[in-house]
Amino acid sequence: KNILNPEAVGDALERAVNLANVQSTDVALAVPTSMVITKIIEMDADMNDDEREIQIRDDAEQYIPFPLDEASLDFEVLPDRLANPNRVNVLLVATRIENVEARAEALELGGLTPKIADVESFAIENAFKVFSDTLPMGVNTVGILDIGHTMTTLSVMQNNKVIYTREQVFGGKQLTQEIQNRYGLSFEEAGRAKKSRTLPDDYDIEVLEPFLEAVVQQAARSLQFFFSSSQFNEIDHILLAGGNANIPGLAKLLQQKLGYRVTIANPFLQMGFSPQIDIKKIENDASSLMVACGLALRSFD
């Protein structure tokens, strides 16, 4: 998820903003969870924010495995009640400055103004909260399986909080490459054919089904990592997210193979829409917009 060509990303963003006729240029960005360090530390309750920051920076070597002058960090006092009323839990979040600056640079090249830097897992948590009550009664532990272009991320939610995140290098790019190789297409042509579902008759059996089986294996492996590193041995529900969540047959196959109910995430399920919004397009893309939705909701914090 590194930005290798900020100019190209900025150009694409500028064209997207112009096409969408966006009124505000203020933006919230998210850094991948794998690039971020989070720690919960206990501090005195009567400290103000300036005092907390000084204390955190003084103790930074305990928490951050790279030089402080290379770190972008923030903190927030959590509402947790501790046994000692004179102490509070503080969430510390840190990443390398370059991880924020690379994204900010691309946004600025696209004519946008970065205002907030968040973390992908926090954005997903934010988005999940607005539609979690649409899940069946008794669902408390939910796995959000986000299958992107090159990365698949499992985020496990417990009572509307992210308690586990695991990323692995696997995504829809593999399917596009298989289409490209089998049918002699360019990568761009293969991507368009995959999206429009205009492929030869043998596509489902020869290309799609092996890819779906690979997704199941990746999902099962991620769940096993979660179970082996926590006190949990099962989850209640799986939500499919990401640009590949709507691949025909994927949700059904995951449900059959993993033994959990699987549905496709839609963070906009309970939202109203402006008349000029193409609702059908939003519904088609909803599963891939979890992070974007969570970031947009920051404006209501």
Model features per residue range: what roles?
Residues K1-N18, D202-V207, I279-E283:
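N-terminal phosphate-binding loop and adjacent alpha-helix
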Residues E7-N21, T134-N140, R221-F225:
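Phosphate-interacting basic helix/loop segments used at nucleotide- and nucleic-acid interfaces
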Residues Q23, L29, P85-R192:
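Small-residue (GG/TT-enriched) beta-loop-alpha framework at ligand/catalytic clefts
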Residues D26, A30-S132, H237, P267-F273, ...:
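Active-site neighborhood for divalent-cation/phosphate handling
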Residues A106, Q174-T176, L212, A251, ...:
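Terminal alpha-helical anchor/extension segments at protein ends
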Residues S121, V169, Q177, N181-R182, ...:
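Adenine-nucleotide phosphate-binding core of ATP-dependent small-molecule kinases
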Residues N126, A245, T263-D301:
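Glycine-rich phosphate-binding/hydrolytic loop that grips phosphoryl groups
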Residues F211, E234-T263, P267-L269:
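Glycine-rich phosphate-binding loops at beta-strand->alpha-helix junctions
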